[in-house]
Amino acid sequence: MIHSSNYENQKKLGIPFFAVPNTLKHFVDPGHGWYRVSREMLFRMDLLDKISSFSYQKGNWVYLEEDVDASIFFTRYKELFGELQIRVTTNISENMSSIRYYQPFQMGMGSGCL
């Protein structure tokens, strides 16, 4: 069911209904975890200036650290789109994740800058 206020939020943000993420990848290593979200989606959700350098970036993807930055994302998602109806697929590594070697997040960096 599409709530009209949520639909209006999507229109204001320029996010087509089909572009709202409904599946996220969650990467976990023995010490931490990250959710992968496109930089464009963070931009459209007005979150780029709220993400810390504890998250990482590579190309058009931002890997939100699971403690604070991912919570900010999920709270905003619920504000804009209503109930959280996101499927999460988890990739668990027994070793240190390669994400730790990506560039720390910076708002003006990355190939997805808008």
Predicted region positions:
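Eukaryotic non-globular interaction segments with acidic/serine-rich, low-complexity composition
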Residues: 1-29
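Intrinsically disordered, low-complexity segments enriched in small/polar residues
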Residues: 5, 12, 25, 31, 33, 61, 106-110, ...
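Compositionally biased regions
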Residues: 5-6, 38, 98, 112
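Compositionally biased, intrinsically disordered low-complexity regions
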Residues: 16, 33-35, 110-114
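Short, flexible coil/linker segments at or flanking structured domains
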Residues: 23-25, 52, 61, 90
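A short, structured beta-strand/loop element
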Residues: 31-58
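Short, compact, well-ordered microdomains
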Residues: 63-114
